[in-house]
Amino acid sequence: MRGSEASGPGAIFGAPSTLTTSVIRNPTSFLSSSTPLPSTDADVVAQNVEHVLLSLTSHNDGGLVGVSGNSSGSTGKGILIGVLSAFGSATVAVLVLAIFFFFKYTRRGRIFLDRIGRPGEFDDEQAFAREEAEALEVMDDMSRSEYMRAKSFVEANPPESMQTDISLSQFLAIQEKGVSAWEFQPELEIANCFVEGRTEIEFYDSECSVQTNLPVPKQNDVYYWEAKIYEKPESTHISIGMTTKPYPLFRLPGFHKTSVAYLSTGHRRYNQPFSATPYGPPLAQGDVVGVGYRPRSGTIFFTRNGKKLEDVVHGAKTQNFFPTVGANGPCTVHVNFGQMGFVFIEANVKKWGLAPMTGSLAPPPPYGSEQGSILLESGRESAAQISQRVYQDARTNSTVRIPPSRSPGPVRSPTDISLAPLAHIPSHEDVGEGSSHANTIADEQTPLLNTSDLDQVPPPEYSSPDGSRRGSDITGDLPNQNSPPIPSYDAAVGNQADNTSTPDGDH
């Protein structure tokens, strides 16, 4: 194919270019050489051919323009779709955030008669009043009086009305003692339970509860503690859970606001004094009940003998909960805050105790191991030296001084003024105050006794000889006045010289 033929309009649409070129150059010859058409004029055919060629040419140019227009239109549509999708995503995100913050900050304005999955929580005061009226009609006099007493206490002391956050001194005590900083403190006015060893609680015949001195911390993800029922008669009901302060401790936990408990009957109570909700198996002697608290979500759950039960409380993030145990009869409950291993394995592995087992305060050393301690060793040495010195003084000093007997009555100083008649004291006997002189004379005349004589008691058959000192007076102890005088040093030296010179004179 030649270049002129390739560049013809037939090359664009794939038509034979030679035929098209020949028709364009000499359309009349093409028509004359072809088969004659019936009743067709040559001019009309030529006009039709020209019209076809013009239409083909115009169609080719328009096709090129259409292709470029379609490509530019598709690009614009893609950009528009991307912008609209971005704006749509942003709008959806803003709408979701608006709904979230709306429900978060308007929760107090909503009223739920029954929250999902947690029946028995009253957010409507009218519903609570109706429930209260129905329950008071069927209560006996004792139960009604106890409930009204607790209601008065709650109205006078609303929950969380006192400061219960862990103070700096309590935090330092936890750092020093560890989990030993927690202990149960019974109410002295009730005095119906006895706490032994910080965590061993013994209840008596009437209804009461006991709380810990410190609340559950909120630094970790989960905190957990367990209570084991050591002794429980069939008629005694035990309630194990958590409460806030102040709380009426003459009532069981779970019966009033901001308290939750697992009852030994197998029910649970959450701010519910009238009706209990079935929760788990009943509790018997030897069972272990665990209480877990998640501060970040405000969730409280229970376990029984190492098996986790469903969550009871949700959203209690601002309250300070205190571990609480209550009973209405004689029983014994031992509580484990983390000083021992838990029955719940997950809490054991993840160390969900209230605090570490040991704090920074070292325990006291055992008896008999004072070595290495300067203070204890020095104290032991000083005590040994003092005891040895006293023993030596008792051995060397054989006499003791017996003080004179004093007359009964108050001891008066020499300067005391009394209205009693004074005895006449001659001036030559006492120049100053006579009492001091009399005391010195009495001290000088105090007899001395031998300690060995006091200790050695003679047998009944023994009789002291006549020349012995026993039974003699004080003059026997004095030296003999007729004995020769003791020679001086010079006289003794002179006598020795005379004795040495006498043998020489004999020779």
UniProtKB/Swiss-Prot annotation:
Region (Disordered): 385-417, 448-507
Any one cellular-component term (Gene Ontology): endosome membrane
Keywords: Endosome, Glycoprotein, Membrane, Protein transport, Signal-anchor, Transmembrane, Transmembrane helix, Transport, Vacuole
Biased composition (Polar residues): 385-400, 496-507
Glycan attachment residues as annotated in the record: N397, N450, N499
Domain B30.2/SPRY: 146-342
The keyword Lipid biosynthesis is annotated on this UniProt entry: no
UniProt xrefs under Pfam families: SPRY (PF00622)
Record topology, Lumenal segments: 104-507
Membrane topology value: Single-pass type II membrane protein
SUPFAM superfamilies according to UniProt: Concanavalin A-like lectins/glucanases
Keyword Transport recorded: yes
Cytoplasmic side stretches: 1-82
Protein purpose: Components of the endosome-vacuole trafficking pathway that regulates nutrient transport. May be involved in processes which determine whether plasma membrane proteins are degraded or routed to the plasma membrane.
Listed PANTHER family: RAN BINDING PROTEIN 9-RELATED
Protein name: Protein ssh4
Organism annotation: Neosartorya fischeri (strain ATCC 1020 / DSM 3700 / CBS 544.65 / FGSC A1164 / JCM 1740 / NRRL 181 / WB 181)
Lineage: Eukaryota, Fungi, Dikarya, Ascomycota, Pezizomycotina
Gene that this sequence comes from: ssh4
